[in-house]
Design a protein with these regions (language model features):
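Periplasmic c-type cytochrome electron-transfer domains
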Residues: 58-76, 254-255
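Conserved beta-strand scaffold positions in the cores of enzyme catalytic domains, especially
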Residues: 80, 124-126, 229
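Acidic active-site catalytic centers that drive phospho-/nucleotidyl reactions
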Residues: 92-95, 226
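A short beta-strand-turn-helix
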Residues: 71-88, 116
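Structural alpha/beta surface segment adjacent to cysteine/selenocysteine redox centers
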Residues: 86, 94-183, 215-218, 248, ...
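C-terminal cap of thioredoxin/glutaredoxin-like
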Residues: 2-51, 58-61, 109, 179-257
Length: 257
């Protein structure tokens, strides 16, 4: 029966004593931990830098713990344009990544603004209703527009988002693109970026979404006219309804849209 190999006073093939070998092993172990620590620190720097700072990642999903009682939902803040005393209140629930919303924003919204809002007939309120399950950038886009609103440029940013929807809607991440758009509309990009790369306005957008759900909104764009669900196939149909509700006679000049 072979004898167990015994530990000798020198390590095989090295000429080193056992004590020296153990010391070298401890030194190598320390070096490994130092290297691992440096690597971990580098990863942390990369992780934080990719998010634009220590504030955390840009919020792209609704907030889970937003209160849903009726009183809280009534505090959902839409973005308003027009006189508060206008006879007709038009509420829009929209998604920045929705193609139909893009068509409405491009062709119908300018007519509403010029012919109804600016004439004192309509007060329009836009609520965010991001269909985040099918439009992965919609929630972030809604937040981005509200970050622009902090600097008084909501509608300018709104228009750019819709005009360039085909570009950003197919990107893997839209954060940097949205920051570029901030510069396009003349925002302080540093302030905008700090807002976007955080959870700022996430609760506000979520409250908009929950309010729409409570009112039965299921798709975008959806509209309420003086509190009643409304559909219209053309701008002219909407204008006729507005004049009717305001008790006024429509102008003789009409549009073909």
């Amino acid at each position: 029966m072979a004898k167990p190999t015994k530990q000798t006073s020198r390590s095989r093939g090295t000429g080193k004593s056992a004590a020296t070998t153990r010391a070298d092993g401890r030194k190598a172990s320390r070096n490994i931990w130092i290297i691992a620590g440096v690597a971990a620190a580098i990863l942390v720097v990369i992780f934080v830098t990719s998010r634009g700072g220590t504030g955390g990642a840009a919020a792209t999903q609704p907030v889970a713990n937003v209160e849903m009682d009726p009183a809280s939902l009534q505090t959902a803040r839409g973005i308003e344009v027009g006189s508060p005393t206008a006879p007709v209140q038009l509420h829009e629930y929209a998604d920045f990544q929705c193609p139909a919303c893009q068509q409405f924003a491009t062709f119908i919204h300018p007519l509403i603004k010029e012919r109804l809002v600016d004439q004192g007939l309509v007060r329009m309120v836009r609520y965010d209703f991001p269909l985040f399950n099918i439009h992965p950038h919609a929630f972030l886009a809604a937040r981005a527009a509200r970050c622009a609103d902090d600097q008084g440029k909501y509608w300018e940013y709104h228009d750019v988002l819709y005009a360039r929807q085909p570009t950003w809607s197919v990107q893997r991440s839209a954060v940097n693109t949205f920051i570029e758009y901030a510069e396009t509309v003349g925002l302080n990009t540093s302030t905008f970026e700090q807002c976007l790369r955080s959870d700022q306005h996430a609760e506000e957008v979520t409250r908009n979404l929950r309010l729409g759900e409570a009112l039965g909104v299921t798709g975008t764009p959806s509209f309420l006219i003086n509190g009643q669900r409304a559909t219209f196939g053309s701008y002219q149909e909407l204008e006729d309804r507005v004049y009717q509700m305001a008790g006024l006679t429509p102008p003789a000049e009409t549009t073909s849209n």
